[in-house]
Amino acid sequence: MDITLTIFAQALAFAGLIWIVATKIWPPLLKAIEERQQKIAEGLAAADRSQKDLAQAQEKVNEALKDARTKANEIIDQAHARANQIIEAAKLEAIAEANRQKDLAQAEIDASATRAREELRRQVSSLAVSGAEKLLKREIDATAHKALLDELAAEI
């Protein structure tokens, strides 16, 4: 065989191989590569969207936590205010009860003092009558009068 014919046959076989590769193998290969590139691009875009969504969700969570803390502080403040109201009401009730007890004690003291005065009046009147009887029974001279007054003073 001639070298020219061999080169020509190899060139023709190579051209046929290129044509087969270009028409049958290359298009599906390019299509697969493009699909893979598109999937990778979609994956990267999805990752970017996910990061943005995550950032937005984090902002929402932070806002919700801030709102929850604010509401919790409001509830705590309301509880403190209610506790202070209860304490003030208890103080006022205790003061009122103390005043009522004081008034009852004062009334009892006044009643006891009145009873004691009445008892003293009865005793004084009894002593006065007794002293008058003794004076009328005796002859009155200065020494007897003084002794009688001393005796009455001792009884009082």
Curated annotation (Swiss-Prot):
The keyword Glycosyltransferase does not apply. GO terms for molecular function: proton-transporting ATP synthase activity, rotational mechanism; proton-transporting ATPase activity, rotational mechanism. InterPro entries: ATP_synth_B-like_membr_sf, ATP_synth_b/b'su_bac/chlpt, ATP_synth_F0_bsu_bac, ATP_synthase_B_chain. It is found in: Cell inner membrane. SUPFAM superfamilies: F1F0 ATP synthase subunit B, membrane domain. It is a single-pass membrane protein. Keywords: ATP synthesis, Cell inner membrane, Cell membrane, CF(0), Hydrogen ion transport, Ion transport, Membrane, Transmembrane, Transmembrane helix, Transport. Its main location: membrane. GO terms for cellular component: plasma membrane; proton-transporting ATP synthase complex. It holds the Pfam family ATP-synt_B. The keyword Transport applies. The chain crosses the membrane at residues 3-23. F-type ATPases have 2 components, F(1) - the catalytic core - and F(0) - the membrane proton channel. F(1) has five subunits: alpha(3), beta(3), gamma(1), delta(1), epsilon(1). F(0) has three main subunits: a(1), b(2) and c(10-14). The alpha and beta chains form an alternating ring which encloses part of the gamma chain. F(1) is attached to F(0) by a central stalk formed by the gamma and epsilon chains, while a peripheral stalk is formed by the delta and b chains. PANTHER family: ATP SYNTHASE SUBUNIT B, ATP SYNTHASE SUBUNIT B', CHLOROPLASTIC. HAMAP family: ATP_synth_b_bprime. Belongs to the ATPase B chain family. F(1)F(0) ATP synthase produces ATP from ADP in the presence of a proton or sodium gradient. F-type ATPases consist of two structural domains, F(1) containing the extramembraneous catalytic core and F(0) containing the membrane proton channel, linked together by a central stalk and a peripheral stalk. During catalysis, ATP synthesis in the catalytic domain of F(1) is coupled via a rotary mechanism of the central stalk subunits to proton translocation. Component of the F(0) channel, it forms part of the peripheral stalk, linking F(1) to F(0). This is ATP synthase subunit b. The lineage of its organism: Bacteria, Pseudomonadati, Pseudomonadota, Gammaproteobacteria, Lysobacterales.
